[in-house]
Amino acid sequence: MATLAASSSLLSCLLVLFLSSVSAVTDDKQVYIVYMGSLSSRADYTPTSDHMNILQEVTGESSIEGRLVRSYKRSFNGFAARLTESERERVAKMVGVVSVFPNKKLQLQTTTSWDFMGLKEGIKTKRNPTVESDTIIGVIDSGITPESQSFSDKGFGPPPQKWKGVCSGGKNFTCNNKLIGARDYTSEGTRDMDGHGTHTASTAAGNAVVDASFFGIGNGTVRGGVPASRVAAYKVCTPTGCSSEALLSAFDDAIADGVDLITISIGDKTASMFQNDPIAIGAFHAMAKGVLTVNSAGNSGPKPISVSGVAPWILTVAASTTNRGFVTKVVLGNGKTLVGKSVNAYEMKGKDYPLVYGKSAASSACDAESAGLCELSCVDKSRVKGKILVCGGPGGLKIVESVGAVGLIYRTPKPDVAFIHPLPAAGLLTEDFESLVSYLESTDSPQAIVLKTEAIFNRTSPVIASFSSRGPNTIAVDILKPDITAPGVEILAAYSPAGEPSQDDTRHVKYSVLSGTSMSCPHVAGVAAYVKTFNPKWSPSMIQSAIMTTAWPVNATGTGIASTEFAYGSGHVDPIAASNPGLVYELDKSDHIAFLCGMNYTSQVLKVISGETVTCSEAKKILPRNLNYPSMSAKLSGSGTTFTVTFNRTLTNVGTPNSTYTSKVVAGHGSKLDVKITPSVLSFKTVNEKQSFTVTVTGSNLDSEVPSSANLIWSDGTHNVRSPIVVYTSDY
């Protein structure tokens, strides 16, 4: 396996050389790599001689001295040579040549998400190592892999004195000075048998591990946002799900154990009333004890009202792309290349395989349409075995191995996500899939090869993931959710060798690629921990505010509510800016109780949420929209009327004394809003001083298709404290 991994890594490097700038040019010639697939099995085949013959034929020169740069002849077949553009075109058409691409200067790759956000490795990023080492992240998930290099305690001292937890991970499970605590609520032991918990924990706080990859894909340094911090794992999930009672027990223990914040990449398909939501209840208790809870928004997008984790005392995270993605090319027998999506580590050794469309291999039990979608029991095994199965949808993933196919090509509705499969596979968007179908219908012997996945860079980003759950918030309609977005697409992080990289996958890996708001959530948890290392006495709401008000604005890339604040909240997280926000919106337990009273919750319900006996009075009750939240949102009763809505807010100075902030309003989308800020200038003489203001929004004839929005920015010339303002009329 080590040899295979090494050759796969080398091949992967060669296949991504077309991503950078050209490095070698001689006159009008430049160095190209001619990739020819696997080595010939013929005993009399000599690669270098073949390469020289090809060059002589293409160039018309008997002596090719200075032309041949390098022959690849041990693990695969190919060569590098100095060619003109016309020579490159000729060699690309020759039999046996898979692809020709320019030579480039390469740099070692990282897993990119933290670099993408500006939190770079080593001395490039300001750190507070002593405080970071005292920071404890509680991970409520499917457990953890203690042997992972991401959780090695090399260089770590003993746990912080505040730590009161235990290591009760079960048999053959040992904690250390990095992984300082483990608890199990499933009777299986805390060891991660799935991989999800290991992945999220390493994303938030994993050590920097060089040369990590998924069989050579994404090779580079994998690390968490706060590598010097400690981890405590709380296992609440099994393959059948995560029980409410286990979740609450984990919150209970984590808070008492002394964690500084909690990351929980768990949720429901839709939001629940707070009193019925174990995460909302647990997070309320965490907030009351000074512990921030970061929660995933859910993977039920792009449909509206699908976001979960909507309580204002939770930092709710959507998922978006980074500047790196993965593509898998499908080369058809006619030479045409289609670009698909998957994370395919398999190599088909340069060999084309026969293609068979599911509907052309229909079993007697189904019609051609069902077989075309490769539905269960609809494909005849005898007509598929040894071939690449083509399916009109992802249903083929369930049957492809059982019918004996050697690969799979399917139509995918998700253009932005690459998944791992247990055999060579690629998902094609409709246009490319139709090209594939046309090819299938044009020949009696269609063939293709699915190439190993390549990394692509500098794509448009960040873009909100299609799967990321959207608002509006149906439980607290005047609280904008999700709050923030972060990298959650094709994230490489530590994994459990006991888990499967994909369903029915027999491979065992230490690092894997996953997508979901489960992946974006620990990114924000890592940012929250990073912010806390510079501001250890900050409350959860101050950290949440800092993250939200310093976020990058996200440009709408689509239409409808799926591309509005209901998709990304305040924007894309910016770790460096969040560590020094200038001003924050601060909240405590009493503010949240006043908010709940304003939602007309009964004393009985309030006790369920807060654990305390609370009697609401007018003095304690506030309109939900007047909660001192970093974003501002209001749901109105109708779209055709003139309206006026106000928001009351208070800012706390956490920057410098004697600072003055001036307000500015930037228009968003939807109907035009008239926004007035009173007062429009705030002056702070001291640190921790508070100043209040009112936002008055007026307008008429609101757009009923999308929310209407604007952005309020307070600036002192150094800090820009931005809050989205959203007004809407329906649940869409």
UniProtKB/Swiss-Prot annotation:
* PROSITE patterns assigned: SUBTILASE, SUBTILASE_SER
Residue ranges annotated for the Peptidase S8 domain, each copy included: 113-579
Q: What is its EC number?
A: 3.4.21.-
Which residues carry out catalysis?
A: D141 (charge relay system), H196 (charge relay system), S518 (charge relay system)
Q: Where in the cell is it found?
A: Secreted
Q: Which GO terms describe its cellular component?
A: extracellular region
Propeptide cleavage-removed residue intervals: 25-109
One GO biological process term is: proteolysis
Residues bearing attached sugar chains per UniProt: N172, N219, N458, N555, N600, N648, N658
Protein modification: The C-terminal propeptide is autocleaved.
Q: Which InterPro entries match?
A: Peptidase_S8/S53_dom, Peptidase_S8/S53_dom_sf, Peptidase_S8_Ser-AS, Peptidase_S8_subtilisin-rel, Peptidases_S8_3, S8pro/Inhibitor_I9, S8pro/Inhibitor_I9_sf, SBT
What positions does the domain PA occupy? 352-436
Predominant place of localization: secreted
Membrane-spanning segments: none
Molecular-function GO term, any one:
serine-type endopeptidase activity
A Pfam family (short name) is: fn3_6
The family database entries (SUPFAM superfamilies) matched by this protein are listed as:
Subtilisin-like
Q: Where is the signal peptide?
A: 1-24
- Keywords for the protein's UniProt record, in alphabetical order: Autocatalytic cleavage, Glycoprotein, Hydrolase, Protease, Secreted, Serine protease, Signal, Zymogen
**Domain Inhibitor I9 residues, every copy:** 31-108
On whether Glycoprotein is a keyword of this UniProt record, the answer is: yes
What does the similarity note say? Belongs to the peptidase S8 family.
Please state what the protein is called: Subtilisin-like protease SBT4.13
Give the species this sequence originates from: Arabidopsis thaliana (Mouse-ear cress)
